[in-house]
Structures are given as structure tokens and as C-alpha cells.
Amino acid sequence: MPSADYVIVGAGSAGCVLANRLSEDPEVRVLLLEAGGRDASINVRIPAAFPNQFHTKLDWDYETEPEPHVLGKRMYVPRGKSLGGSSSMNAMLYVRGRPLDYDLWERQGAPGWGWDDVLPYFKRSENNARGASEFHGVGGPVEVGEQRSPRRISKDLLQASVAAGIPQIPDYNGPEQDGVSPFQVFQKDGRRWSAADAYLKPAMKRPNLQVVTGALVQGLVLDGDRVTGVRYRKGRSGEQVASASREVLLSAGAIGSPQILLLSGIGDPDELREVGVTPRHTLPGVGRNLQDHPFLGAIFEVSDTDTLYQADKPKHLAEWALRRSGKLTSTVAEINAFVRTRPGLPAADIQFHMGAAYYENHGQETYEGHCVVIAPVLVSPKARGRVWLRSSDPADKPRMVTNSLADPEDLQSLVAGMRLAREIAAQEPLASKVIRELKPGPAVVDDQELEDDIRERLMLIYHPVGTCRMSDTAQDAVVDAELRVHGLRGLRVVDASVMPVITGGNTNAPTMMIAERAADLIRGRVGAATAEAAA
């Protein structure tokens, strides 16, 4: 029976950070359990190939229940299933979110998670190509830089955005977020730089860190109100128990972590009994508060041939393999913009992802021609969903619903975002290169037609959060401000599921920050990152 001081469940964006930081102490034994396998696929390494991982063994391949406000369709929810987790399959976009996001966390019962508290942890993790500054760090494990070989038409997208009235800003991860600028990316020398690359692989040579892949967790071991270990299966072997002398740390993500809690009898007792799980600890908030960013693309065929069309040709593969440059270094979305679509908003309600590609149906639909996509993303959705068990079998995927577009204001923002996308495409230097609008198409004109198109084509942009809400005071909270599960000892949740409210932007960088700060909380070193930054 394996044992350790800390047993970490999930080698994703948070689990890799925890494994590295906790094993820095040679006297501490750390066991990391990962359901997936190694991250050796070429589709992990090549930035532009990330959609090739969808619906493969590298993907948990979830989908929602029929969504009541999106024509009853099931929405695809990919999640990484290998070392690095979703940081090994995402679009590598480094976006922290806005200071007001974290100050809101603090106001909602999470002291110590305001912007001034979390900024030092962002800086600690970074090795930013821009150099050290008030907002950025160097020397950290996470490589952050600019696009290595941006598409020529990406500059046109940026300049057209400015012509449409969106100011150009130097750094959306700096003092001002509203505006347009190139995306910053998790890459090193033209290849993906995941949490596994940054944190786990450098630590795997340590004798006090053990990593077990192919380990599907069945549930937690409880002794009264204390969690003492984890039950898991590896391959065809029988159930094994990993004992934790100090703590179990759940880092299985916003879908996996609540599923494990529920399978362990931690949640709403009535709902647990319905699927044959014996209740062990009442915590009704488990699985509630699910949030994600809905999006869709305005897509235009263009005359410029410097796009990602036919990027998988041998010559482009050779350029990436030999020089780590060219089309395949693209993250598909190369230009970012945060905008407020109407007066009176406290912050941007739409984030644009813009790139030189036809991106529809999560990249699974193709088009024979050169295209650009201008995709409005709903930054602060008001909809709240949930995750719950399908059955008591750990191998059964959980059920989930996001309730996307339940709030009319969310739909209003996306309609405005689609109109602004068209306005950007109508500005030079882009307008003269646009051949025609493909999506939603020129026949879609008035608000009702745009709303219908949005409901038909809406996607989720791979940012599920919130299902183990952090708060010292909220009634539906699952963990406190130190990420300890309410009412239990020896158990914390450390991943995107603890976010009380989704951040205004991509969620991978915030998840790594959460784990950096959690490592200090666990080690009793809170404030260490602030002291390091001041040194």
C-alpha cells in the first residue's frame, strides 16, 4: 500500500505545481496520481495541433446534458487526460484576469485572495520574456512570451480593431485590460510549455516524489471526519489505497474534483442516495456554481494566404520540426481584445479571440479556403450550472449542465459582440482582404436572427470553474479561504473548481496561481511570495 505525507489527485495545471513545490522539502514524501498517461504525443508539443487532441485518449471528452437555453443541445467539454492535464491540450493563452476579479473573490468570503495578494504568485511562477517589472516576473518555471511566428494578417486584425474604436494597449496582463493587443502565450522556443513541462518534469528526479499514471481514483478514505487516503485502480489490478499522513489534495479539475467528492459521499445526501452512494458528510455546494465562458466565431474568407489553412502540410511540419517556427507555432487565436459593449459596465463583458483560421465546432469542421475568425467570448457569464453523478460507478462520466444563456444580458452581450466583430472586419487594413462572411453569414441581420445563430452555434471555451466554491461565509461554499473542505480534516481542493466567480479571461494562469498560493498555505509560508517580490 503506497503512502506519503501528501497524496495529490490529478497531474494537471494545479497538481503539477503542488507536486513540485511540496517536494522541494526533501523530508516530505509526495505521491501524485494521474488518471491519464504521459504527454508524449506530438499533438501536445505542436501549438497549432491542440484541436487534434479532442475526442482522443488524451481527452476526458465530456459533454453537458441538453442545455435548456441553447436549443436543448449537448455542449462539448474537453478536459486534458495526461500529465499536464488541460495545460497540455489548451490554446496556451496566458491571461490572468482583472484585478477586480480577485477583489470580488475576497469580498465574497475569501480573505487573502485579493489582487494585491495574488499578484506576487503570478510573478513568482513566471519567466516572462518582457522582463521583470511591477507586473511581471522572471526566473520562474512558467515560460511566457509572444507568438513566435505570428500570421501577417494578425497585424491587420489588430489594426482593424483599433480602427473600430478599440484602443491598443501594451499588456493586458498589466495595469489596463480594456483594449487590443497580441496574446501572450505559454511557449518555449515554439513549443507548448505546459504545467508538466514547467513544474512536474524538473521535479520527477527527486526521490521523495512518486508519480503514478493510469490511476483512476474511486473515492476518498474517511475515518470519521478525517480523510486519510485515496482509493484508486490502475489498469486491471484491484483497488489500491494510497495513505496520506498529512493531507489529500484534490486537483482533478472543476469536473473531476466534485465527482470524487460525491463518489466519496460528500455532498447533498438526498442526491447521493438517488445514485446509490452512502452519504458520509453533508456539503450541498459540491458540484454547484459551475461556470464557463461561452463563445462563437464570426468567420470571414480572406484573400491573404498567410493563414492556418493547410498548416498540416509536410513543409510546415518540417519548418516546425527543424526550426520551431512557422504556422504550427500559432495558438490559432493570436490577437486578444477586451471590450465593453455598452455604457455603465464596471469592466469588459466581451473578450475577442482573433486568428487566421476557420474555427467552428471546436476546430472539427473544416473549410477549403483562407479565413480569419473574430470570436466574441462572454467574459462574466451570469449563468450558473452544476455537476452531479450519473451513477456510483467512478468510470461513468458525471452529468453536468451550464445553463448558458439563461440570463438575457448574457445573450445581449454576445449579440453586441457579433456586431462589433463585423465592424472590425469592415475596417482597413482588413476590409479589402475580406472576400465574404461565412459565419453567421450575410442573411443574418437583425437581433432575433443573431440570437438564433448564437443559440445554434454556441460553444464553451474550455474554462469550467467554480464547482467547489471557496468562501468562509457563503452558504454553498465547499472550501474555506485556505482551501480546506468545510467540516473535514486532512482534505483540500486545489484547482479551478475553487474559484467563487470565473475570472475575466482564460483560466489556466489563474489555476497555476491558485496552486502556487496553496502550496504556501499548506507549508505555512503565506506571504512568502510577497516577501520574495519585495526582495
Model-predicted segments: where are they?
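N-terminal redox-cofactor-binding region of secreted/periplasmic oxidoreductases
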Residues: 1-535
